[in-house]
Amino acid sequence: MPTTRETILATLHARLQTLAALALRDEVLPERIPAAGLIILRDGQPGEPEVTLSPLRYHYQHRAELEVVVQAATGRATAFDTLIAAIGTALDADRTLGGLCDWIEAEAPASVDLPVEGAAALKAAVITVILHYTTTGPLA
């Protein structure tokens, strides 16, 4: 049986796969960026939990990251904005991931344009997604 953390991350990845962009999990950046864009979910770190006793529970604010990349000769800013908005809509649709989390929220992206020699430039950002959830133990 998978841990709470793995179940939540797999569900988040499945949610991102419904978008037009290619959604990967903990993969290396591919050589080619799909026309619709690319999202790579990085599992991130659960951090130090707050612990409550009776019953014993571990409350995490897990910080996962989404690496978001679009590549286009023209309209790169619009394509990037469209992809960011689609991610926001997907997260807003169910902020508990079907009851697995207490709450999920994304932080604002800080984007950067990256020139590519001999190809269209990239626009990329890392979006931190904070997953608030509770487990019965650090390894549960």
Give residue ranges: language-model regions.
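Conserved short beta-strand elements that form part of the metal-binding/catalytic scaffold
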Residues: L41
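Charged, amphipathic alpha-helical segments and their flanking helix caps
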Residues: M1-I33, G44-A140
